[in-house]
Amino acid sequence: MSDWHIAQVNVGRMPGGRGDAQVAGFYAELDRINALADVSPGFVWRLVGEGRDAIDLRPTPDPLFLIKMSVCTDADALFNYVYRIAHVGVMAGRREWFARMDAAHQALWWVEAGDLPTVSDALSKLWLLDNFGSSEQAFTFTARFPQPESFGPAVEKQPDPWCIGRA
C-alpha cells in the first residue's frame, strides 16, 4: 500500500443558484455523480457539507462559488473517474453551468495516506498554480508529478483540455 494519496480540488462559479433553470441539469446529476464517486475504484474521501454534497459550503464570500474536493489512492484512479467514467459526460455541461474562470479551477497534490485536506489547503493549491505553475506542491493532470518519494520531472499527460485547470 502506498504511503501517499492524491487530493484534488475543483472550483467553479455558477451563473445562478439552485433554483436557476440554467443550472438545473447540474443539480439533477449531482446525487448520481456523487454516488458514482463513492464506489469508484481508488476512492478514499470527498468533501461533504451538511447534506450529501459540498454545495452548502461557502469557501469564499461569493454564494455562487462552489468547491469539490476528493482524495483517491492514486492519480490513475482519479484520472479514470474524472475522464473515463460517467463523470466525463456531466463535465461536458461545465461551460453551461459554470462561468469561465481566468484562474486555475482545478489542482492536484499528494497527501499522506490517512490525511484529509482542508478547504484552506485546496484554495492555497489553486493560488500556487496561478502564481507559479505546476510543481510538486500543486499540479494538474497535464503536468502530473509523481508521489513525493519519487519526485522528478512532471509526467506529461493529454486528457481532454476542456476539463483541466489552467496552469
Name each model-derived stretch:
Residues 1-63, 104-167:
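Short S/T/G/P-rich N-terminal loop/turn motif that feeds into the first structured element of a domain
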